[in-house]
Amino acid sequence: MTNHLECVTAQKSQWYWYLLVIFICFMATNTVGAIPLFIILITQWIQNPKPLTDINSFSQESMMSGIDSNLYLASMAFSFVVFLAVAIWIIKMFHGRSWTEVINGTKRVRWSRFFVGLAVWGVLQVGSFAINYMTDPNNFEFRFEPVRFIFLTIITLTMIPIQSSCEEFVFRGYLAQGVASWTGSRLWTLLIPSVLFALLHSANPEVTKYGFGVMMANYFLIGLTFGLISLLDDGIELAMGAHSINNILGSMLMTYEGSALRTDALFKAKIINPGEDLFIAVISSIVFIGILAFIYKWKFGILTRRVSPPSPVLS
């Protein structure tokens, strides 16, 4: 028996309860969580009013164009703080599971694994960037504004790990537990949240700019990688750490035109080749899984083992 997937009880374990939880969290995110961004947009509109009849003035691109990138990043990350807080509360109320049980099925978080995931994935990503920079330095524009970068660093290091961990909590944690309880299959538990994770990111600006197919493949690969290590490790701490450093580097080290994280990162890539990036991501993911499998002596046979059905609710 494993802890993470098999800590689920029969308390409100049907699929529609999970759908309701996600719906409530999204509603909270788009109301309470959107307050900072709403205030920023109203302030911007007061300073630079646009006629209500100008429909184009209310496009996302137009609205975001005048917003300070650090303020936008902070307001975006705040919405995930709200989502995570509401999710923890609702899951406990509906299913009786604590936030630590959603993470690994126990009452304690294995923080050492969080930092191992962060370190290993971080080294791979920095190494990949270094190779790209050395082979084509002219493709990168170095930008360093000390004051703005200090604020970016503070916002990134305090809020991006929450944003990233929130996504892991929902997909590799909560939804994975739900799928496992419905299907009893670890393979479906790997695939379904990975597909949903990719679809969630389909509205990102990268998809419009670089193509649906290749970007969905990138997102699906990330979801699959983080899902696989979570199944093998019986918890999502490694994925939380890896996802956190992935987005931290995307915020602080390198950005590009069309990125969902529009920040004053140290470097801006002039040209992005999504097909090449997908190939590099495949290699990085294989190496990442291999290193972790060596460290933790994982047994891949567990992927075909059935998940026990939800246990009865104790009165």
Question: What residues fall within each predicted segment?
Answer:
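Membrane-helix interfacial "entry" motifs
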Residues: 10, 14, 18, 64-72, ...
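Hydrophobic alpha-helical transmembrane segments of multi-pass integral membrane proteins
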Residues: 79-90, 118-128, 191-195
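Transmembrane helix-loop-helix hairpins at the membrane interface
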Residues: 153-314
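Residue-level signature of transmembrane alpha-helical entry/exit and packing/kink sites
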Residues: 14-18, 22, 68, 72-76, ...
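C-terminal TM-helix exit segments that contain a strictly Trp-centered aromatic cap at the helix terminus
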Residues: 33-40, 127-132, 249-255
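Juxtamembrane helix-loop-helix connectors linking adjacent transmembrane helices
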Residues: 61-68, 74-77, 99-166, 176-177, ...
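Hydrophobic/aromatic residues in alpha-helical transmembrane segments
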Residues: 32, 86, 127, 175, ...
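N-terminal, membrane-interfacial amphipathic/helix-forming hydrophobic leader that caps
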Residues: 1-98, 264-315
